[in-house]
Curated annotation (Swiss-Prot):
Region of interest (Disordered), ranges: 341-461
CDD domains: cyclophilin_RRM (cd01921), RRM_PPIL4 (cd12235)
Keywords, ordered alphabetically: Coiled coil, Isomerase, Nucleus, RNA-binding, Rotamase
Protein name (database record): Peptidyl-prolyl cis-trans isomerase-like 4
UniProt similarity note: Belongs to the cyclophilin-type PPIase family. PPIL4 subfamily.
SUPFAM superfamilies found in the cross-reference section: Cyclophilin-like (SSF50891), RNA-binding domain, RBD (SSF54928)
Annotated source species: Aspergillus oryzae (strain ATCC 42149 / RIB 40)
Length: 461
């Protein structure tokens, strides 16, 4: 009575102790027959102690129920677990001892219950497990696989960083009859979506054997990042999962609020040609947010600026320089704004490439361009703006004259120091002036006649 376990690290052959623990052996054999253990992960490894498996999903899955016995699969959840009594003569004194993982029954603490999970010892004389795990088999082949499991890289919870899974189970000999309702599948089933979701580093992925634990953890994080990127692509947040940040763009932060675009452009331009340099500002207030993006023409200049400008003092602030990667959203918004500016310079207007912003108001504007000369739109090249004539028609002039010479008292009230009530010499009507001149002429003529008559009279005397 033996079972062959095909694992991702090699094959293990287990001889079952059907006479000492028949119920545990029957449960294990029938679960292997229905391929229940296929793709089950080794979810706990304790170096030189044990490794544990048998849960198809593993404890990290939210859908895991911890596993089920064969009777639970056939008859329902009430039979998910079954009670076991540890054989008194069997001890965990040899490496490769196989036993069912048990827990105290919630109804009777002295009774142990089991489901589908089992453990395999990686050391000798492990009497701690006696009475807590029920022995039902021993490993007879595949001790090299046990050594590989024992040397596997694990995290702080004991889970291998690279998946170790049971791929297939093959029953070499089965002395037990099948329980009612058991139907063996014709072929091994494919992993379910819930099982695939528990993959960390696939068991078939080639890794460097010389990698330390830190490198393994880094690789695991990279795999998780790729999985998250694929999710973002599916929901439309990324154009494609393998999108990478630009390699010629620097992210500069910890800037002084007074630092301007021109200042950074001047400082960083010594490393190469800069396509764009922009300090990001608040859209509402226009205040500097104290970080900027600098786009170089080529990657080499960008890398040189990265190594030379880290921690440099600019406007009494030591700046931090990095490649645009961890701030991808900020970089994306800045890049979109830059592209829209460039498209506007190429002729696009209002987000429509077929429209063009009008650059002049009149056809003659180009002919009147002057250096250092600011003129109005309607000046047509006159250096000094012309003033409007306020006497455009005789009627308007006459009306204006009548309003201007209404009453001497009114004029006196307006400006008593400039005009007095008896001052009538400032006449605004040409006709009135002509009559006044005529009267003045007649008056002078009469005076001369009187003077002549007086002169004649004196001569006669």
């Amino acid at each position: 009575m033996s079972v062959l376990l095909e694992t991702s690290l090699g094959d293990i052959v287990i001889d079952l102790l059907v006479d000492e623990c028949p119920k545990a052996c029957e449960n294990f054999l029938k679960l292997c027959k229905v391929k229940y253990y296929n793709f089950s992960p080794v979810h706990s490894v304790q170096k030189n102690f044990t490794f544990q498996t048998g849960d198809p999903l593993g404890p990290d899955s939210s859908e895991s129920d911890g596993g089920s016995s064969i009777w639970g699969l056939l008859e329902g959840p009430p039979k998910r677990t079954f009670s076991l009594e540890p054989p008194p003569k069997l001890k965990h004194d040899e490496r490769g001892t196989v036993s069912m993982a048990t827990v105290p029954s919630p109804h009777d603490p002295d009774q142990r219950i089991a489901a589908s999970q089992f453990i395999v010892t990686l050391g000798e004389n492990l009497d701690y497990l006696d009475g807590k795990a029920v022995i039902f088999g021993k490993v007879v082949e595949g001790f090299d696989v046990l050594e590989k499991v024992n040397e596997a890289f694990i995290d702080d919870r004991g889970r291998p960083l690279k998946d170790i899974r049971i791929r297939h189970t093959v029953i070499l000999d089965d002395p037990f009859d099948d329980p009612p309702g058991l139907v063996a599948p014709a072929e091994s089933p494919l992993p379910s979506k819930a099982q695939l979701a528990t993959v960390r580093i696939a068991d078939d992925e080639e890794l460097d054997d010389n990698m330390d634990e830190e490198s393994m953890e880094k690789l695991r994080r990279e795999r998780e990042a790729r999985a998250q990127a694929l999710t973002l692509e599916m929901v439309g947040d990324l154009p494609f999962a393998e999108v990478k940040p630009p390699e010629n763009v620097l992210f500069v932060c910890k800037l002084n609020p007074v630092t301007q675009d021109e200042d950074l452009h001047l400082i960083f331009s010594r490393f190469g040609t800069i396509l764009s340099c922009e300090v990001i500002r608040d859209k509402r207030t226009g205040d500097s947010l104290q970080y900027a993006f600098i786009e170089f023409e080529n990657q080499k200049d960008c890398e040189q600026a990265y190594f030379k400008m880290q921690g440099v003092l600019i406007d009494d602030h030591r700046i931090h320089v990095d490649f645009s990667q961890s701030v991808s959203k900020l970089s994306e918004s800045w890049r979109n704004a830059t592209i829209s500016k460039r498209s506007g310079q190429r002729g696009g207007f209002g987000g429509v490439a077929s429209l063009e912003k009008k650059r002049q108001y009149r056809a003659s504007d180009n002919a009147r361009e002057k250096e250092n000369d600011y003129t109005l739109v309607f000046d047509k090249g006159d250096k000094a703006p012309r003033r409007r004539s306020y006497s455009r028609s005789p009627q308007r002039s006459s009306n204006r004259d009548r309003r201007a010479s209404r009453s001497p008292r009114r004029d006196s009230y307006r400006d008593p120091y400039r005009r007095r009530p008896g001052d009538r010499s400032h006449s605004r009507s040409p006709a009135r002036g002509e009559y006044r001149d005529k009267d003045r002429g007649r008056y002078n003529h009469r005076e001369r006649r009187r003077d002549d008559e007086r002169y004649r009279e004196r001569r006669r005397r």
